[in-house]
Each structure stands twice: as C-alpha cells, then as structure tokens.
C-alpha cells in the first residue's frame, strides 16, 4: 500500500513524499528503507502517527491502525551517540580526575603534606569502583535503547565528572583530612563492607543481564540474590557501598554525594517498580522498592 511521509520539525532532505510499504511490514524495515533514501542513520529517525504515537521497533503498521494513504511523520533526532559509549565516557571522568588529584595534590592545595592512610584507601576504592563500572559497561550491561542525542552527553556526564569527580576528589584529598585516623579493625570492617556491597551490586547486574538474551527486549520478573526482598537491589548495594565510603573518608562531601546519588536512584527505582506492577499482574506485592523491609 502507499503511505505518505512528512517531516516533523526540521525538514529532512531527500525524504520521499510517499512510499509503497506493506501493512504487515515491520517498522524496522521501514526505518531501513527511509534511512537508505535519506542517508541518515536509522538511530536518527523516529516515526509517529498523526496523533503523535511513536512507531516502535518490532511492530507493524497494522498495529497502529495505519491504512492506505495515511501520513507517517518522520523526525530527525539529530546526531546520536551509543549508550555504551556514553557510560564509558561518564565513568572515565572520575577515574582521570581522581588520578590527577592524587598525583598533584600538593600543587592543587598549595601545601606540603602527605596523604593519610584513609585518603590513600579512598583513592583505591574510587578507582576500583569506576573500573568495575567501565567493565560492566563493556561486558555486562545490555541497553534497551541503542543511542541518545549527542547534545545530551554533557548533561549526562555532569553528575559523574563534577560530583563524583571534582567535588569528591577536592574535599577528600585535602590537607584538612591528612591527619584522620581510623582504628585498624574499624578500617578493615569498612573495607570489607564496601567490598561486599560492590560485589553484590555486580552480582545483581549479572542476574539482570542474564534475564535478557542478547538482542532481545524480553522483560521478566527478576529473582534471586536480593531481588526477593526489593525490586532494585543493585541500587541498594550501590548506596550501601557509598555509605561505607562516607564512613571511611569522614568527609561531608561523601555524605552529600551519598544522599544525592541515593535519592536519584530511588526516583528511578520508584518509576521502574510501578512499571513492574503494571506490566506483571503476578509481581510480588511484598517486595519493597529499594531498601529491604523499609522502602
């Protein structure tokens, strides 16, 4: 059948006015055809009906009640960047920033002093944390969306580069903490607690990865390690790790980072939890959102 194509927003050069396309043809095939004609990557193209309903991949025109002669609106989303690349850039920032501070702290603070053991351990924990995140971004995580607008990269990186990078580094490695002391047994407890939280977070990410086969967008109810108590144990263990970190560093900046990060994760978790309840009628109602037995 013949459908009409029209640009939504900025005019798309070389977009054909009409196209012969079967009613049961997949939206993926439609994207490929329009991409080949306009020479725009498929990730830049978004299709919608006249009422603004977005045409999703792995669906057909028939699903949206599109008939012969109907108008399909095509929007150019602009330059895109892969989500995997976004995550890698986000986590690279703190790694570079903390390394810069640890190598140049005397020059940065204009004072001759030596870092205490707590500060050195804090540096190691930060580096291990974000190296783990880089590893997960490359080898573990599967992304439901392939790309995001390139213009959003600065906004996405701000939290990690500024808050967990510059903000944490400046206030953790400063001379005001150079004489901090924690009893060895207390220090060992905090390190072991941090390691437990980080490894538990990694374990939950592996469980989530294994729930979705590669190339699939299938969604199922997660179970197992932590998931029987809360919907998002990965967020809980992430917050727990930063709690141990804040106790170790004794820095008010670490507590602010813990609060801001945990609050943001709870907002995400609350929305996703509501989606679980709506999508799965048999979803366990006893599960809390993020904090076991409480919230």
From Swiss-Prot:
Q: Which residues lie on this side of the membrane: Lumenal?
A: 106-157, 208-223, 269-295
Its keywords, alphabetically, are: Endoplasmic reticulum, Lipid biosynthesis, Lipid metabolism, Membrane, NADP, Oxidoreductase, Transmembrane, Transmembrane helix
Q: Which InterPro entries match?
A: 3-oxo-5_a-steroid_4-DH_C (IPR001104), SRD5A/TECR (IPR039357), Ubiquitin-like_dom (IPR000626), Ubiquitin-like_domsf (IPR029071)
Q: Where in the cell is it found?
A: Endoplasmic reticulum membrane
Organism's domain of life? Eukaryota
Record-level GO BP terms: fatty acid elongation; very long-chain fatty acid biosynthetic process
The GO terms this record gives for MF are: oxidoreductase activity; trans-2-enoyl-CoA reductase (NADPH) activity
Tell me which Gene3D superfamilies the record gives.
Answer: 1.20.120.1630
Q: How does it sit in the membrane?
A: Multi-pass membrane protein
User: Main localization of the protein?
Assistant: endoplasmic reticulum
Does the record bear Lipid biosynthesis in its keywords?
yes
Residue intervals passing through the bilayer: 85-105, 158-178, 187-207, 224-246, 251-268
State the PROSITE patterns in the record.
Answer: S5A_REDUCTASE
Return the similarity comment. Answer: Belongs to the steroid 5-alpha reductase family.
Question: Can you name this protein?
Answer: Putative enoyl reductase C646.07c
> Which organism is the protein's source?
Schizosaccharomyces pombe (strain 972 / ATCC 24843) (Fission yeast)
Output the lineage of the source organism: Eukaryota, Fungi, Dikarya, Ascomycota, Taphrinomycotina
